[in-house]
Amino acid sequence: IVLVHGVGLNHKIWEPQIDAFDNSVLAYDILGHGKTPLNKDNISFDNFSNQLINLIDELKMKKIHLIGFSIGSLIARNFASKFNDRLESLTLLCSIFNRTKKQQQIVKDRFELAKKSKSLSKQALKRWFTDDYLEKNPNTYNKISSILEQNNMENFLKVYELFVNHKDNEKFENIKTKTLVMTGEGDIGSTPEMSENLSKVINNSKVKIIPKGK
């Protein structure tokens, strides 16, 4: 199992999942996050796919179960469209697709705010988790807040801009592995409707919507 985190985060967000799985699990820092440098000004999702294929080749992993969250799901989509033969399965968590002009503008406004403030708003946690969950899991709030605060803002903005401008231009017809598309019932950024529509363009896929989830 290979886990790909979201923008502004790092591999440590997957610690509960690593503890839960009996399988061998790999969680890594994507380019420009955690301890992984980003040495390019012009980046694309191909760079992230190349990072992943080089990593699993180095570790001699022939086939993997790939799970991506948020921008990690876009990396996973790109990877699957290019290296489908290396996948046993694909899971796309909270994956944007076919955003409306209004949805696109909200993300652009958030990006502009991040550029001006030079910091990551903890409001992101309000988007990612319900109030009830954060109240019951204060350690999660503190842990992810700490990760957000440690970001290299220059690198973060480069990667975030890639997410903001994404146009769903993957070759979905190349994705033939069994795929699960998941999001939360209350996710306003990657909505249930997006997941339903994404599943329609990926053969051999199904959708799971988490009740009361964000």
How does the language model describe each region?
Residues 192-214:
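Catalytic histidine neighborhood in serine/cysteine hydrolases
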Residues 46-64:
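Conserved acidic catalytic loop of the alpha/beta-hydrolase fold
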Residues 1-41, 55:
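Conserved HGGG/HGGXW glycine-rich cap/lid loop of the alpha/beta-hydrolase fold
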